[in-house]
């Protein structure tokens, strides 16, 4: 996502589609810090900030304006083409959304074959992650170290874990799509500023949010995927 922001701001105009409203807000804030609020727009299903002379549009993928003819266009997490609920939107963007001078699709290697078949002239770039992961074994939630994110797979589960952490650790932030934009943003800021050392969230935070997390824990090994309960898979 950092690379996409750099490329967009290198052009006179640009549009970027992101999978989460919270991520769109994060990218919007970064672009405003670099270019100022008078030229950056934010469009999601909940927020709409469009200055009269907007040059850069930061949006959720569903809310992307595809008719403005921007010099640059990017779609993040393009592997969501395979998602049962949102896949049709990402597939439409893959097939039809283009920048006048540059188009960038970011996502997992699982899309390499599809993109090569549909866009044979596309250039593939790999960006290595700088962080490393190591398995720390199972732990009780009350034993989690500071700067931990605990991922739950239902609203009830998230609230129950948050209450347990508040009782045992003194405080935590809660991030879910069901919260209002203002509340979500405030909760992320609470954690990022170090006011609390624990974050409890749904698994949506895995789609590109840049958080200062040293440890990640899952509340279980099964989740409801919209149709059935299933095991988590890598």
Name each region found by the language model:
Residues 1-14, 29-34:
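Walker A/P-loop NTP-binding motif
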Residues 12-27, 103-106, 143-168, 172-176:
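Conserved strand-helix element at the start of the C-terminal RecA-like helicase core
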Residues 32-71:
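Inter-Walker segment of RecA-like/P-loop motor cores
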Residues 35-46, 125, 169-181:
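Conserved RecA-like helicase motor-core motifs
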Residues 60-61, 76-78, 220:
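Walker B catalytic acidic pair
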Residues 66-69, 79-91, 203, 209-212:
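Conserved ATPase-coupling elements of RecA-like P-loop NTPase cores
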Residues 79-134:
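Post-DEXD/H (motif II) to motif III coupling segment of the RecA-like Helicase ATP-binding lobe
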Residues 168-181, 185-234:
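Conserved RecA-like helicase motor core of SF1/SF2 enzymes
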């Amino acid at each position: 996502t950092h690379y996409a922001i750099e490329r967009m701001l290198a052009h006179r105009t640009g549009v970027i589609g992101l999978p989460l409203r919270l991520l769109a807000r994060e990218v919007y804030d970064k672009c405003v810090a670099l270019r100022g609020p008078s030229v950056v727009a934010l469009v999601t299903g909940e927020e709409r900030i469009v200055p009269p002379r907007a040059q850069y549009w930061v949006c959720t993928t569903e809310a992307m304006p595809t008719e403005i003819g921007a010099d640059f266009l990017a779609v993040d997490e393009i592997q969501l083409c395979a998602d049962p609920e949102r896949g049709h939107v990402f597939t439409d963007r893959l097939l039809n959304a283009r920048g006048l001078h540059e188009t960038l699709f970011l996502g997992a290697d699982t899309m390499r074959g599809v993109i090569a078949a549909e866009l044979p002239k596309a250039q593939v770039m790999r960006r290595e992650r700088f962080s490393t992961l190591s398995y720390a074994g199972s732990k009780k939630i009350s034993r989690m170290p500071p700067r931990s994110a605990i991922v739950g797979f239902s609203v009830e589960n998230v609230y129950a874990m948050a209450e347990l952490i508040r009782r045992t650790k003194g405080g935590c932030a809660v991030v879910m799509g069901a919260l209002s934009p203002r509340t979500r943003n405030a909760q992320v800021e609470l954690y990022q500023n170090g006011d609390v050392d624990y974050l409890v969230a749904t698994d949506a935070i895995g789609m590109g949010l840049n958080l200062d997390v040293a440890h990640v824990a899952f509340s279980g090994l099964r989740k409801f995927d919209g149709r059935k309960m299933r095991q988590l898979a890598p």
